[in-house]
């Protein structure tokens, strides 16, 4: 059986934790930042865990990570 190709954009955007959860960066942090508070921008710097509904799809896209 052939190997599954890894989805290129997904391998750059997602990491798997030791327990198998999918770690991702938060959105809304690239531009139009002047109207956002410092607290909001600081919290957007942190990573978060993807929802379980999305995680199952993401794991199929990055099978060897």
Curated annotation (Swiss-Prot):
PROSITE patterns: RIBOSOMAL_L35. GO terms for biological process: translation. GO terms for molecular function: structural constituent of ribosome. GO terms for cellular component: cytosolic large ribosomal subunit. InterPro entries: Ribosomal_bL35, Ribosomal_bL35-like, Ribosomal_bL35_CS, Ribosomal_bL35_sf. Gene3D superfamilies: 4.10.410.60. It comes from the Bacteria. Keywords: Ribonucleoprotein, Ribosomal protein. The keyword Ribosomal protein applies. NCBIfam families: rpmI_bact (TIGR00001). Belongs to the bacterial ribosomal protein bL35 family. This is Large ribosomal subunit protein bL35.
């Amino acid at each position: 059986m052939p190997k599954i190709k890894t989805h290129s954009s997904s391998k750059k955007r997602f990491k798997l934790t030791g327990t198998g959860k999918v770690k991702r960066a938060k959105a809304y942090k690239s531009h139009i930042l002047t109207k956002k508070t410092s607290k909001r921008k600081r919290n957007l710097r942190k990573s978060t865990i993807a929802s379980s509904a999305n995680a199952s799809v993401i794991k199929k896209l990055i099978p060897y990570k």
